[in-house]
Amino acid sequence: MTGIPSIVPYALPTSRDLPANLAQWHIDPERAVLLVHDMQRYFLRPLPDALRDQVVGNAARIRQWAADNGVPVAYTAQPGSMNEEQRGLLKDFWGPGMKASPTDREVVDALAPQPGDWLLTKWRYSAFFNSDLLQRLHASGRDQLILCGVYAHVGVLISSVDAYSNDIQPFLVADAIADFSKEHHWMAMEYAASRCAMVITTDEVVL
């Protein structure tokens, strides 16, 4: 069966749950960009209310920190109502996807893009695919990417791998991402910490 599965409530990770990081990078506001990944109504709708509220709340805290510290903010958002060519192989795993209506496409109010933010159309798992994200990072002299959003083991993780592959240091914010299950969430954290990224908490970003 294609599409986003039913999601059972689970507790977000705390600092005690994080896997050991191999890399020892540190966020520098002069080098970083925040990526708000796919926080559209369509993708957040399947999440249990408490989980959704926590993830959105933590992402909003990071969004405010970015604004306060001059850190650019990038958003990915699928366009909705893709035709067959645009949808490609996504349809074999996820079905037709979202509609282009605001009830599906809009980023949730608490994280709504602001003037000057980078708006990227999302076509595949990676935020870098068929977008100018890498060019924007290079043009702004930024080589760190802080990631929050959904879904952890799909687009968030693949975007982290793509950042790493382009010598951009990814920081995966463990309690500002969500997934289909605790197992998927933990798998994404463990892979990221051991293969491509730093896994950190919201407090480590904003405090």
Curated annotation (Swiss-Prot):
Its EC number is 3.3.2.15. One of its GO terms (biological process) is phenazine biosynthetic process. InterPro entries: Isochorismatase, Isochorismatase-like_dom, Isochorismatase-like_hydrls, Isochorismatase-like_sf. It comes from the Bacteria. GO terms for molecular function: isochorismatase activity. The active site is at 38 (proton donor). Substrate binds at residues 78, 87, 122, 151-155. Keywords: Antibiotic biosynthesis, Hydrolase, Virulence. Pfam families: Isochorismatase (PF00857). Involved in the biosynthesis of the antibiotic phenazine, a nitrogen-containing heterocyclic molecule having important roles in virulence, competition and biological control. Catalyzes the hydrolysis of the vinyl ether functional group of 2-amino-2-deoxyisochorismate (ADIC), yielding pyruvate and trans-2,3-dihydro-3-hydroxyanthranilic acid (DHHA). Belongs to the isochorismatase family. This is Phenazine biosynthesis protein PhzD. The lineage of its organism: Bacteria, Pseudomonadati, Pseudomonadota, Gammaproteobacteria, Pseudomonadales.
